Curated annotation (Swiss-Prot):
GO biological process, one term: proteolysis involved in protein catabolic process
CC per GO annotation: HslUV protease complex
Ranges where the ClpX-type ZB domain occurs: 1-51
Protein name: ATP-dependent Clp protease ATP-binding subunit ClpX
Protein's organism: Bacteroides thetaiotaomicron (strain ATCC 29148 / DSM 2079 / JCM 5827 / CCUG 10774 / NCTC 10582 / VPI-5482 / E50)
Superkingdom of source: Bacteria
Native organism taxonomy: Bacteria, Pseudomonadati, Bacteroidota, Bacteroidia, Bacteroidales
Residues reported to bind ATP: S120, T121, G122, T123, G124, K125, T126, L127
């Protein structure tokens, strides 16, 4: 009996029963615990590669939302900004039509139209991009341009943008190659003037140069887990040709560049007529590519962001609407949170007016509305889940009391 045991060995590695943890018996052989684990890992890796090769969700022109439908969807989540919505709706529709062109065998090749949105903080740039990705069910990621640096310097490599997109797409490469990347604060990587720099600018002009290959469409080797590249790391090739890049920035001070350009054009040429139609309270609507160049974006990157649109500054009426009207408005979110605890939350109308007044006073934009509401609601959200109340009404006096005891300086930089 002992002799028969010694003859048992793993059919894969050849080790005997005494040399392994245990043997699993099959119909015509054995496998040890070590080989079983290794076989499982190989199987999982092969299945993962198969999923990647399976490809992305097949686009269908009939199912692709038309520009009017895209705008209607945006209207449900974003208040105002009709011009920006129309630009985005048309550009996104044409971009995904372009992806279908490769199956048609047409001789006319449609070029990619990446987008740049200019507007003050809190006007809805990020929300617009996120909402479009939600409608189209494509991978979407947001990248802060301020953390990007040239390769070899402290900070994140340009390729880390694609690493994030891959992670969102669960490493399905074809799916990621149809995704949307929103690069926020693109204005922060502007060079310090209109002229090329003679010194090294690793987080400004250098990053712009690095972004060129991503924006124009090329195959980029991406580290799967992000971070710096090293020789032993397996790279994933990603083709950026069909990735839609949307860039956004506040471009603080660009109004002066626009005004200078308009004044230059006006002098000596029907000056009185042109000056009369210029809205000095909203200079962004007159923005042109040469203004971006004057601000510090290099001509090459401007050329790869051919769709330029602007977002209007939010007035008091727009902020009031943003607070309560969209499908996922801030107030509706808090009502839902309380509803999950079995509590009916209501507000006095004067509370909404007060919140908007403070957002205007501190120039916080739409993003600041949440900070103000959060400050007002913090104490009640802490206490009321432990109480037996079924209803709670936020009064103007309570809202004022909460904001007065809060650190308003913190809200001002929200």
């Amino acid at each position: 009996m002992a002799d028969s045991k010694t003859k048992k060995k793993c059919s894969f590695c050849g080790r005997s029963e005494n040399e392994v943890g245990f043997l699993i018996t099959g119909m015509n052989g054995y496998i040890c615990d070590s080989c079983a684990t290794q076989a499982y890992e190989i199987t999982q890796e092969a299945l993962g590669e198969g999923r990647k090769r399976a490809g992305a969700t097949k686009l269908n022109l009939k199912e692709l939302p038309k520009p009017v439908e895209i705008k209607k969807f945006l209207d449900q989540y974003v208040i105002g900004q009709d011009d920006a919505k129309r630009f985005l709706s048309v550009s996104v529709y044409n971009h995904y039509k372009r992806l279908l062109q490769k199956d048609s065998g047409d001789d006319v090749e449609i070029e990619k139209s990446n987008i740049i949105m200019v507007g003050s903080t809190g006007t809805g740039k990020t929300l617009l991009a996120r909402t479009i990705a939600k409608l189209l069910h494509v991978p979407f990621t947001i990248v802060d341009a301020t953390v990007l640096t040239e390769a070899g310097y402290v900070g994140e490599d340009i390729e880390s943008i694609l690493t994030r997109l891959l992670q969102v797409a669960d490493y399905n490469v074809p799916e990621a190659e149809q995704g949307i990347v929103f690069i926020d604060e693109i204005d922060k990587i502007a060079r310090k003037g209109d002229n090329p720099s003679i010194t090294r600018d690793v987080s400004g002009e250098g990053v712009q140069q690095g972004l060129l290959k991503l924006l124009e469409g090329s195959v980029v080797n991406v580290p799967p887990q992000g971070g710096r590249k090293h020789p032993d790391q397996k790279m994933i090739p990603v083709n950026t040709k069909n990735i839609l890049f949307i860039c956004g920035g506040a471009f603080d001070g660009i109004e002066k560049k626009i005004a200078q350009r308009l004044n230059t054009h006006v002098v000596g040429y029907t000056a009185s007529q042109k000056t009369a139609v210029i809205d000095k309270n909203n200079m962004m609507q007159y923005i042109a590519p040469q203004d971006l160049k004057s601000f510090g974006l290099i001509p090459e990157i401007i050329g790869r962001l051919p769709v330029l649109t602007y977002l209007n500054p939010l007035d008091r009426n727009a902020l009031r609407a943003i607070l309560t009207e969209p499908k996922n408005s801030i107030i509706k979110q808090y009502i839902k949170l309380f509803e999950m605890d079995g509590i009916k939350l209501t507000f006095e109308d004067s509370v909404f007016e007060y919140i908007v007044d403070k957002a205007v006073e501190y120039k916080l934009g739409a993003r600041g509305l949440r900070s103000i509401v959060e400050t007002i609601m913090m104490d009640v959200m802490f206490e009321i889940p432990s109480e037996s109340k079924k209803e709670y009404k936020v009064t103007l006096d309570y809202a004022k009391q909460q904001l007065e005891k809060a650190n308003m300086a913190r809200l001002q930089i929200a």
